[in-house]
């Protein structure tokens, strides 16, 4: 597993890395680049930089197919806190990705189980995901794979923990009662099937999760630790998010990644 310890803005690094991978891949209509995408606060800077790169002519999303990580159950698609709304407002509306290339879970599907099974099959039909990007919760969850989730789990409906709902209440007028209790989410196994996984971590409140991801063993109570099992897992952090790491751990990764901090590769 790689750790990219930055001063700030892990989203900038991820955007540059992804753009480089897309260009190298040279996608076409017959062979698109398949990208897994997150929501939340930390990825906003990644989307802004991807939009900047697109406007500068450095990357196109015309032949990119996207799959999002998760969606709340019961929120209308046009609700300001639905992930459909988030993705279009923060990314899709600003780049050249065709509408038919966008895949998002339907949190209002009449049969959530069938919706999740179909989503998994659609990923398989596209040949799998090249890069899946995610964030991490304060309790170490990735996507909505809450603590004690199976590390081989697939896309499914999940009950959100009190901690997750409290953390997300900042997007719902700080009223936890407005935060949905359920969500559809890709599984840990779904993420691990991707050819590469990038996890973004920003802020002191993510520092404990980062330490469990890097310095502790694989543990289903900290689902981010499953990144250790991936052949091409990358954890991109700002300085605050590394505060719980041992000094020698941080020094080690700074030394081996010194050439990649400003030139993502």
Swiss-Prot record:
It comes from Maridesulfovibrio salexigens (strain ATCC 14822 / DSM 2638 / NCIMB 8403 / VKM B-1763) (Desulfovibrio salexigens). GO terms for cellular component: cytoplasm. GO terms for molecular function: glucosamine-6-phosphate deaminase activity; identical protein binding. InterPro entries: Glc/Gal-6P_isomerase (IPR006148), Glucosamine6P_isomerase (IPR004547), Glucosamine6P_isomerase_CS (IPR018321), NagB/RpiA_transferase-like (IPR037171). The record marks 149, 156, 158-159, 252 as: Part of the allosteric site. Pathway: Amino-sugar metabolism; N-acetylneuraminate degradation; D-fructose 6-phosphate from N-acetylneuraminate: step 5/5. PANTHER family: GLUCOSAMINE-6-PHOSPHATE ISOMERASE. Catalyzes the reversible isomerization-deamination of glucosamine 6-phosphate (GlcN6P) to form fructose 6-phosphate (Fru6P) and ammonium ion. The gene is nagB. Allosterically activated by N-acetylglucosamine 6-phosphate (GlcNAc6P). This is Glucosamine-6-phosphate deaminase. CDD domains: GlcN6P_deaminase. One of its GO terms (biological process) is carbohydrate metabolic process. Transmembrane segments: none annotated. Keywords: Allosteric enzyme, Carbohydrate metabolism, Hydrolase. NCBIfam families: nagB. The keyword Transmembrane does not apply. Pfam families: Glucosamine_iso. The active site is at residues 70, 139, 141, 146.
């Amino acid at each position: 597993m790689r750790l990219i310890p930055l001063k700030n803005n892990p989203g900038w690094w991820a955007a540059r890395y992804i753009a480089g991978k897309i260009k190298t891949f040279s996608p076409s209509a017959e062979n698109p680049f398949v990208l897994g995408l997150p929501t939340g606060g930390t990825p906003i800077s990644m989307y802004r930089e991807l939009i900047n790169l697109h406007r500068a002519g450095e990357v196109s999303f015309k032949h990119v197919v996207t799959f999002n990580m998760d969606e709340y159950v019961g929120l209308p698609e046009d609700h300001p806190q639905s992930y459909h709304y988030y993705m279009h407002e923060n990314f899709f509306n600003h780049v050249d990705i065709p509408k038919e290339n966008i895949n998002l879970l339907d949190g209002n599907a009449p049969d959530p189980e069938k919706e999740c099974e179909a989503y998994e099959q659609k990923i398989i039909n596209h040949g799998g995901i090249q890069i899946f990007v995610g964030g991490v919760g304060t309790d170490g969850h990735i996507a909505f794979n809450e603590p004690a989730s199976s590390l081989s789990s697939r896309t499914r409906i999940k009950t959100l923990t009190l901690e997750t709902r409290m953390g997300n209440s900042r997007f719902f007028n700080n009223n936890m009662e407005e935060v949905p209790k359920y969500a559809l989410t890709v599984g840990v196994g779904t993420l691990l099937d991707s050819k590469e996984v990038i996890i973004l971590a920003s802020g002191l409140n993510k520092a404990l999760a980062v330490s469990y991801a890097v310095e502790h063993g694989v543990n289903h109570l900290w689902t981010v630790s499953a990144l250790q099992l991936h052949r091409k897992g990358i954890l991109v952090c700002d300085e605050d998010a590394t505060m719980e790491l041992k000094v020698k751990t941080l020094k080690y990764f700074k030394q081996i990644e010194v050439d990649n901090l400003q030139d993502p590769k």
